[in-house]
Amino acid sequence: MTRGSAAWPPLPPRLKPIVEAEYPRYSAAEMASRRAAVEAALAAADCDHLVFYGANRAGSAVQWLTQWPVTVEAIGVFTLRERDALFVQWINHAPLAKRLAAEADVAWGGESSIGAVIAALEKRGARENRVGVVGAMNFAQHAALAARFGNIVDLNRAYVRLRRVKSQEEIDWLRIGAWLSDRGMAGLRDGLAVGLNERALGDLIERAYLREGGTNVIHFIGATPMHDPQLGVPAQFPSTRRVANGDLVFAEISAAFWDHSGQVLRSFAVGEEPPPLYRALHAAADAAFDAVAAVLNPGATPAQVVEASGVIEDAGFTIIDDLLHGYGGGYFPPDRKSVV
């Protein structure tokens, strides 16, 4: 492993004001554009109201519409020409939610957030079969909505379609997430040493971006002898195995900036140069990256991507992880009509 004097990744100066803001915010124009898109989706589905849901730090629609990142639970009500109603758990989360979701009417969800949502819909005159939902609500919550408002329209696929093409502002925030992820990898590169266990490697990674406002999404780490490899992918949970000379240490890192994350994967040879197998693997990986990147143009199909990846099999290898996926919205279900 040669450290040299490799520089840490720079942040483009135009993005510094976003990172340094007390609480970064999307512009009013960006938020208005999102609302217009949701209004059009509701009209297409013959719905008047949208219930959007998130829990356990998942549920991107909540933040996308209100700028409140989900913590324990958050359920919102979107209605044309009205302020959103947003009900959060727990009560001690409500003060900050009110500050960040300043354009919504925010309240604690009380003993039942879905009960509060139903009351809000009733107050807004919601009719049967005219309420849509985005987010992974549980069975009891869906049943409660359906008992009061009839057939509930699943708008999750419509929401995914809205999110597939990112705005320029979203791309900027994702660039920050990528910068933070790169910092994590740089921290691993510069701190990696014989004798550290995988838990300590995770500390190197997180320490590199936490101070800049990043949060951990994943840092999968693998360490294995290059002459007797036992791992094909970085492990999802760190072990207490200690790094030794002759190891390959490889990592998959995603750090996020307000739920906008990047992803980076790198490998480091410890104490000696990589043997022929690892050189061949990395040569095949580089060739596959270049071949796939060359076909990623508007209108490209998944079949073209798979065809381009044939250089992997041509080199005598295969893959045991995703060949290609998008970022900034999650993994999407297969769609026969999908184009890049």
State where each predicted segment sits.
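Active-site neighborhoods and metal-handling regions in enzymes and metal-associated proteins
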Residues: 1-340
